[in-house]
Amino acid sequence: MNTAPILLFVYNRPAHTRRVLEALSRNALAAESDLFVYSDAARSEADRAAVTETRRIIRQARGFRQIHLTERPQNLGLAGNIIDGVTTIINQYGRVIVLEDDLVVAPHFLQFMNDALEAFKDEPQVGHIHACEF
């Protein structure tokens, strides 16, 4: 399967980041997927240690085909980081699975998302696919 890249946005929550990485890596398609992580820079000195620890956890992650970590040298804020990251990956790959650091996914999440992206890739009325319904 030609899997969609996974795009994860993180900031200063190392415990959350560890949980999302562990959940993602338990997915069968993780080993076939490239993970792109965009880590925003600390907004203040008070956030610096948590940002550094979050980045350390990402560098130690395993279970993916490749892990690409973008460490922002300056804080872009949530919107700036997401807009730039999504735009970059969409322009490179044409599709993406987007996550933030507080989303712990189910074991078949990557299969579901990749199957749905493939099923609807030529459907002009489908703009996005999401995995959460309230």
Language model features with spans:
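Acidic donor-binding segment of Leloir-type glycosyltransferases
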Residues: 24-70
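Short, well-formed alpha-helical segments that are part of the catalytic scaffolds
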Residues: 13-28
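Short hydrophobic beta-strand elements that form part
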Residues: 7-8
